[in-house]
């Protein structure tokens, strides 16, 4: 299944700015997550296509098209332009596995949604071109409401691995615990490790030897 | 299936202290979530049993036993004491649905685990009495490792609804978006509502009229 993966190669994961040494390192992290998402999509039988807000500066193992419009606009255009069904999977789902993505591909409904934590929407599968797309605000609720208003059937996939987008430092704990691809290794190579601080897991960085 | 729900009636959800007016209101919130979890367990075909750290001060729709030991100790004892299989479901899983809990009950394996966000473990299903239990630190990783060392088969249920424990104010957004039982109504009755602040969903409180 055609699977669009929106990606911001310029200033990705800005809420993690303090966690990384500089923007270039932060971009490296974003590219590692992107590679994992593309691999999981492909292993699930999907054909990933990256829709980037700017030309990519590193190798990406999928066709890349550039669309510098807002996320919702670019995604709606990608759905309208392409063959159906089309899935849309966020580029920061570092916990995504082929099994989790297969559950999306296999779900019925005009629209299949996987919620993201914090009211968001991390995966949209569109089986018709007129699926309303809006990632602003409480997007999961809005996607459900808009799709039902349009007379479309909606199915939800209840997946932690698809809900856990990596937005802030606390999310990195789950990357360490649950990622089995490149992102975890990338963090380890950079000197990060999982620690427990007063009973609470956290990710800390130690100088490389 | 016998389902143990550990509950702290004295100082629950202490990380939400600043969100509520006082400890009594915070307890009210915890009891609302507990009621939702018990309802979801029962609707999934489970028989809930509350294991509380102290006597409960409000009506609870399930048998209550008091065990004031540490969480891991009390849960291990509850598994060892009771008929098998026994499931253990955290009391703050306000997003839990019967469907999500049924997936746990239906999963095979000596041990079935549902991860909690941040490295935790939110559901344990034990089919043997010697399932190692430790909620400290990176408990999901530790549960998997300890069970495999003990020669037990481990199955994981990938569920956002079971991963999303309610620990801090940002988690309340998901209660508003995804809870369909008592907790959301409890928040609304208390004057809280979902708002969008600069594109980011948040939960705010407004004075009651």
From Swiss-Prot, chains A, B:
Its EC number is 2.7.7.68. SUPFAM superfamilies: Nucleotide-diphospho-sugar transferases. One of its GO terms (biological process) is F420-0 metabolic process. It is an enzyme of class 2 (transferase). Pathway: Cofactor biosynthesis; coenzyme F420 biosynthesis. Pfam families: CofC. Keywords: GTP-binding, Nucleotide-binding, Nucleotidyltransferase, Transferase. GO terms for molecular function: GTP binding; phospholactate guanylyltransferase activity. It catalyses: (2S)-2-phospholactate + GTP + H(+) = (2S)-lactyl-2-diphospho-5'-guanosine + diphosphate. It comes from the Archaea. Guanylyltransferase that catalyzes the activation of (2S)-2-phospholactate (2-PL) as (2S)-lactyl-2-diphospho-5'-guanosine, via the condensation of 2-PL with GTP. It is involved in the biosynthesis of coenzyme F420, a hydride carrier cofactor. Belongs to the CofC family. Homodimer. This is 2-phospho-L-lactate guanylyltransferase.
